Amino acid sequence: VAYTAGPGLIGSLMVGETVAKTISNVLDIELLPINHLEGHILAPGLEDENLETPYLCLLVSGGHTQIIECSEYGSYQILGETVDDACGEAFDKVGKLLNLDYPGGPKVSKLAEGGNPARFNFPRALMKDKNLNFSFSGLKTAVLYALEDLEEKDYPDVAASFQEAVVDVLIRSEEHTS
């Protein structure tokens, strides 16, 4: 029985571990703790069973934004990561600024579908740096200030411009690794 041992929210991790241990004990089968992030890193192998190492992983989840080199199973090196907010955190916080429900990511993306991504030129931090790190806190702050003078009818443009800036930053990192 495999279960997520971390990282993650402690309450969820404890519930998962307790259920997994119970099933393992009742069925008398092996218990296998799994690192949540390693699951993301290895996910490409679900689509391509012939996936060869080394490969690069752009890991973008709620609490993590990293570029990871997978040289072989169990051997990973972080090449770049966020220096402040993770991409998912930025989406959630911008969603809150736009009066959207949690989680913000899917709701911001849905709102962005009706917006103009070129209306606001939000900052794209660390784009010219040689390293592969990310920064999304300045972008989030720029959205906060932009919203001060806007009406709700402008929110789709804000969402689209924000999302465009995030994607530009993520693509830049991918281009630096090519």
Where are the regions that the model predicts?
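A short glycine/serine-rich beta->alpha loop
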Residues: 5-10, 78-82, 128-131
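Short beta-strand-loop/turn "lid" adjacent to the catalytic site in phosphate-handling enzymes
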Residues: 1-21, 25
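Short beta-strand scaffold segments in enzyme catalytic cores
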Residues: 57-59, 65-69
